[in-house]
Amino acid sequence: MSRHQFDLIMCLKQPGVQTGLLCEKCDGKCPICDSYVRPKRKVRVCENCSFGKQAKNCIICNLNVGVNDAFYCWECCRLGKDKDGCPRILNLGSNRLDRHFEKKKKV
């Protein structure tokens, strides 16, 4: 997700012990590169992202309830991108915001 949309901001704080979750729509994606191939290492999120209501949401889309554990792909683990920090997306993208206001105009 963050690879293709440059306006998305990742948390990147020191990861804790809590595992990141993905919704059914995002299930199987690597949170760094959106690859569905060769999942390897579980995603760990920071303490701020694993607290309260956010703890149960998907770490990529942040809209749906997370059901399955998130994994980094083999390539991101090989390149060391799994050690960059917490991969949770903090903001909505400009595409989603524009879509929201376009729907509001039509009503």
Curated annotation (Swiss-Prot):
The gene is RDS3. Signal peptide: none annotated. Component of the spliceosome where it interacts with CUS1, HSH49, HSH155, IST3 and RSE1. Also interacts with YRA1. InterPro entries: PHF5. GO terms for biological process: mRNA splicing, via spliceosome; response to xenobiotic stimulus; spliceosomal complex assembly; U2-type prespliceosome assembly. One of its GO terms (cellular component) is U2-type spliceosomal complex. This is Pre-mRNA-splicing factor RDS3. Required for pre-mRNA splicing. Involved in regulation of drug sensitivity and may play a role in multidrug resistance. It comes from Saccharomyces cerevisiae (strain ATCC 204508 / S288c). The keyword Ion transport does not apply. Its main location: nucleus. Belongs to the PHF5 family. The keyword Nucleus applies. It is found in: Nucleus.
